[in-house]
């Protein structure tokens, strides 16, 4: 069914402006009478952050910025959905055009700049769907003009954590000036101390919510050492590796590769997977990792798992491969478990040391 929908609609959507096509897709998913997916293979179940995921494949933040259609996305077969990025106050983000398809490279460049309707809309929609169940995380970020960005994250934890399965502290978007400076050791330590204190206040009312940190792929290895050390000391529940990159790998063919913004999709895969493995060896199983960046096939998903991800996310590949990719990836992971004769957990991190020994991706 999803394959037929893809074949009928993708040519039309590809003819539209990318941002318009995305908005139309989200609206269609929101209102389409999608059936509930078949139950997942029990071998795909994952326990992480104190939560039980039916399968390891989620949709990354950015697809459903305003929490408009998380239940529709769960019905597509994702094991979890991450909405956002949501900021405290509404902000328009950067001027259009700000989303570019790199068709020749199967990549995407965006410079949205945390375009957000603000916390009020997200809170209302997430509150309304809370009874539906399913794992829905919320990715949060600071307003561009905020005088105290740490206070923005604290406010969002206090407001949105009660209606979220987990909350992601996004300090790695390249499209908000100065945001990535919050990954520096002293700034990150202060931010996480404030965020986790807010989490404890919320926990007294509704129970604890996992707090994850989303990092950039462009960190130097010494900077990654600092990030992991702070995250471990402050006892975050997990790290998402990684956001989009401001670098441009060698060999990009599409003329739009010159656009300013964060690059995602297939060209990000080598760098994102290397950073995932580097993070895994530093974390030493202190907490789980979510691997994201360039997953476009079952083989790519398995490479992320073997590099150290307990859970994985995708987004850009849906533009080029369609909605049928979700079932394809889950089937490929199940086959890999069969062939290995073990469990999904046995695959996690198997290749991390080998990945970190390879030459740095160019």
List the model feature ranges, each with a label.
Residues 3-46, 110-115, 120:
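An N-cap/entry alpha-helix motif that binds or orients negatively charged groups
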Residues 26, 30-32, 37-39, 174-187, ...:
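Glycine/Thr-rich beta-alpha phosphate-binding loop at enzyme active sites
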Residues 51-58, 132-140, 201-219, 281-291:
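Short beta-strand/loop segments at the ligand-binding rim of alpha/beta enzyme cores
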Residues 66-73, 154, 219-233, 281-285, ...:
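Catalytic cores of alpha/beta
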Residues 80-91, 171-173, 238-248, 301-330:
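Glycine-rich phosphate-binding active-site loops on the catalytic face of alpha/beta enzymes
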Residues 84-133:
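A gly/proline- and charged-residue-enriched helix-loop-helix capping module
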Residues 90-106, 249-261, 318-342:
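C-terminal helical cap(s) of enzyme catalytic domains, especially alpha/beta-barrels
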């Amino acid at each position: 069914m999803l394959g037929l929908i893809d074949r009928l609609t993708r040519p039309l959507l590809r003819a539209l402006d990318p941002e318009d096509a995305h908005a139309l897709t989200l609206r269609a998913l929101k209102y389409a009478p999608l059936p509930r997916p078949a139950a997942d293979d029990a071998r795909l179940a994952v326990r992480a952050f104190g939560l039980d995921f039916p399968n390891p494949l989620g949709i990354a933040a950015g697809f459903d910025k305003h929490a408009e259609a998380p239940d529709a996305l769960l019905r597509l077969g994702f094991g979890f959905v991450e909405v956002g990025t949501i900021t405290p106050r509404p902000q328009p983000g950067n001027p259009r055009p700000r989303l570019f398809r790199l068709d020749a490279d199967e990549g995407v460049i965006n410079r949205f700049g945390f375009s957000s309707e603000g916390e009020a809309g997200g809170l209302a929609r997430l509150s309304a769907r809370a009874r539906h169940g399913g794992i829905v995380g919320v990715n949060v970020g600071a307003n561009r003009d905020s005088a105290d960005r740490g206070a923005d994250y604290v406010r969002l934890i206090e407001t949105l954590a009660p209606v979220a399965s987990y909350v992601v502290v996004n300090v790695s978007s390249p499209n908000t000036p100065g945001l990535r400076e919050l990954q520096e050791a002293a700034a990150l330590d202060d931010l996480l101390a404030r965020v986790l204190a807010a989490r404890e206040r919320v926990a007294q009312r509704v129970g604890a919510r996992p707090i994850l940190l989303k990092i950039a792929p462009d960190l130097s290895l010494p900077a990654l050492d600092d990030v992991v050390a702070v995250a471990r000391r402050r006892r975050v529940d997990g790290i998402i590796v990684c956001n989009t990159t401001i670098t441009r790998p060698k060999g990009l063919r599409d003329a739009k590769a010159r656009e300013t913004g964060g690059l995602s999709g297939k060209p990000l895969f080598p760098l994102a997977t290397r950073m995932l493995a580097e993070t895994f060896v530093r974390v030493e199983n202190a907490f789980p990792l979510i691997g994201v960046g360039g997953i476009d096939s079952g083989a790519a998903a398995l490479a992320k798992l073997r590099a150290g991800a307990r859970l994985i996310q995708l987004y850009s590949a849906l533009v080029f491969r369609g909605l049928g990719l979700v079932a394809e990836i889950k089937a490929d992971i199940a086959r890999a478990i069969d062939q290995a004769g073990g469990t999904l957990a046995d695959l996690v991190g198997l290749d991390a040391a080998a990945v970190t020994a390879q030459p740095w991706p160019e």
